[in-house]
């Protein structure tokens, strides 16, 4: 029975690596996965999913206007698809999350989504908000703060390395602008404590 999975974490927990390993596992068994990634994240090139450890795969891209159900239905008609793997799923819209529930419920294809839970302001991304509400399975992937605690927040820094709490929710960047930290160090960096 197909299900909708949401694998979430702070940055640098291995979400893309886990997605690419899942794709490999399906392919090794002669099965066909569909890989999707957000058009906005072109750090590795448009239509590419890549991990920090050097793994990479081609992917179909989605933006806020893409009907992901129609895309997957069309691909499935051309060739049987055995799963859908979505990288950077925090950038999905509410409608796209609902379309992914239709992929599971109507097409019977498992959907595995990988992404950030919350942004640098400590607020949920739209895609993450609706995946938390609609996914059959929620799986937290863990990474570590510099103090050794579980990191569950993401700090954005300015050009001087100082933590900032203002700005657009989406700004594509890597380790030079973001740091995964625990709640205690997130609050301390933004002077949110008592």
Curated annotation (Swiss-Prot):
Q: Identify the EC number(s).
A: 2.7.1.21
Q: Which reaction does it catalyse?
A: thymidine + ATP = dTMP + ADP + H(+)
Q: What InterPro entries has UniProt attached to this entry?
A: P-loop_NTPase (IPR027417), Thymidine_kinase (IPR001267)
Q: Enumerate the GO terms in the molecular function aspect.
A: ATP binding; thymidine kinase activity; zinc ion binding
Q: Which residues bind ATP?
A: 9-16, 87-90
Q: Does the keyword Kinase apply?
A: yes
What residues bind Zn(2+), as annotated?
A: 145, 147, 182, 185
GO cellular component terms given for this protein: cytosol
* Catalytic-site annotation from UniProt: 88 (proton acceptor)
Q: Which GO terms describe its biological process?
A: DNA biosynthetic process; thymidine metabolic process
UniProt-annotated location(s): Cytoplasm
Write the record's keywords in alphabetical order, separated by commas. Answer: ATP-binding, Cytoplasm, DNA synthesis, Kinase, Metal-binding, Nucleotide-binding, Transferase, Zinc
Cross-referenced Pfam families, in alphabetical order?
A: TK
The family database entries (PANTHER family) matched by this protein are listed as: THYMIDINE KINASE (PTHR11441), THYMIDINE KINASE, CYTOSOLIC (PTHR11441:SF0)
The record's similarity note reads:
Belongs to the thymidine kinase family.
Subunit structure as annotated in this protein's UniProt entry: Homotetramer.
NCBIfam families to which the protein is assigned, alphabetical: PRK04296.1-5
Q: What is this protein called?
A: Thymidine kinase
Native organism: Pseudoalteromonas translucida (strain TAC 125)
Q: Report which gene this protein is encoded by.
A: tdk
């Amino acid at each position: 029975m197909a299900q909708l999975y949401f694998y979430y974490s702070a940055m640098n927990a291995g979400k893309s690596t886990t997605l690419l390993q899942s794709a490999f596992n399906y392919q090794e068994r002669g099965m066909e996965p569909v890989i999707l990634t957000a058009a906005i994240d072109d750090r590795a090139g448009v239509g590419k999913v890549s991990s920090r450890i050097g793994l990479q795969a081609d992917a179909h891209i989605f933006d806020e206007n893409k009907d992901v159900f129609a895309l997957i239905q069309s691909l499935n008609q051309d060739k049987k698809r055995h799963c859908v793997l979505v990288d950077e799923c925090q950038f999905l819209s509410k409608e796209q999350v609902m379309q992914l529930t239709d992929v599971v419920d109507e097409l019977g294809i498992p959907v595995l989504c990988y992404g950030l839970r919350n942004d640098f302001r400590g607020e949920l991304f739209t895609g993450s908000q609706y995946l938390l509400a609609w996914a059959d399975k929620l799986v937290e992937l863990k990474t570590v703060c510099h103090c050794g605690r579980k990191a569950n927040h993401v700090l954005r820094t300015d050009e001087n390395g100082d933590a900032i709490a203002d700005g657009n929710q989406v700004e594509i960047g890597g380790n030079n602008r973001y740091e995964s930290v625990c709640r205690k160090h997130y609050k301390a960096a933004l002077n949110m404590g008592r």
